[in-house]
Amino acid sequence: MAQMMTLSLLSLVLALCIPWTQGSDGGGQDCCLKYSQKKIPYSIVRGYRKQEPSLGCPIPAILFSPRKHSKPELCANPEEGWVQNLMRRLDQPPAPGKQSPGCRKNRGTSKSGKKGKGSKGCKRTEQTQPSRG
């Protein structure tokens, strides 16, 4: 009788612990479920990440991060040529003296009428891309 009670209690404890070990990464992962039907322009993208089926997502995908942080990531098929070209372009460091597409520094006068102040988000030093791995 004592063995039966111990076995039941052990089974209950095990059953309660299993869901916590499966979700111990801090929550579920956002997965792309279908690909965008339109080509995504370089001018609206700031970076990307890869989605692998081996990590629990249903399809392989490239998730492009839009420049506007309030917008959702854009999913694309990693086998399409335009997707590979866009990834290559994002991986390249910007040419010296070139600004990112979203930077408006030195494009005339600001609202206050002062020149040369630069605009929010524009860096005066050379920008570097974070390494992808």
Curated annotation (Swiss-Prot):
The cellular location(s) given in this protein's UniProt record come to: Secreted
Q: Which disease is it linked to?
A: Mice carrying an autosomal recessive mutation designated paucity of lymph node T-cells (plt) show dramatically reduced numbers of T-cells in lymph nodes, Peyer patches, and the white pulp of the spleen. Plt seems to correspond to Scya21b.
Where does the record place the region Disordered?
86-133
PANTHER family linked to this entry: C-C MOTIF CHEMOKINE 21 (PTHR12015:SF72), SMALL INDUCIBLE CYTOKINE A (PTHR12015)
Q: Output this protein's name.
A: C-C motif chemokine 21a
Domain of life, per the record?
Answer: Eukaryota
Q: Which gene encodes it?
A: Ccl21a
The answer to whether the entry has keyword Signal is: yes
This protein's assembly is summarised as: Binds to CCR7 and to CXCR3. Interacts with PDPN; relocalizes PDPN to the basolateral membrane. Interacts with GPR174.
Q: Which organism is it from?
A: Mus musculus
Recorded GO terms, molecular function?
A: CCR7 chemokine receptor binding; chemokine activity
What are the recorded Gene Ontology BP terms?
A: cell maturation; cellular response to chemokine; cellular response to prostaglandin E stimulus; chemokine (C-C motif) ligand 21 signaling pathway; dendritic cell chemotaxis; dendritic cell dendrite assembly; establishment of T cell polarity; immune response
**What function does this protein fulfil?**
Inhibits hemopoiesis and stimulates chemotaxis. Chemotactic in vitro for thymocytes and activated T-cells, but not for B-cells, macrophages, or neutrophils. Potent mesangial cell chemoattractant. Shows preferential activity towards naive T-cells. May play a role in mediating homing of lymphocytes to secondary lymphoid organs.
Q: Where is the composition biased (Basic residues)?
A: 104-122
Give the family from UniProt.
Belongs to the intercrine beta (chemokine CC) family.
Extent of the signal sequence: 1-23
Region annotation C-terminal basic extension: residue ranges?
Answer: 98-133
More info: Three genes code for Ccl21 in mouse. Ccl21b and Ccl21c produce identical proteins while the protein produced by Ccl21a differs at only one position. Ccl21b and Ccl21c have 'Leu-65' (6Ckine-Leu) while Ccl21a has Ser-65 (6Ckine-Ser).
Question: Disulfide pairs?
Answer: C31-C57, C32-C75, C103-C122
Keywords in UniProt for this one?
Answer: Chemotaxis, Cytokine, Disulfide bond, Inflammatory response, Secreted, Signal
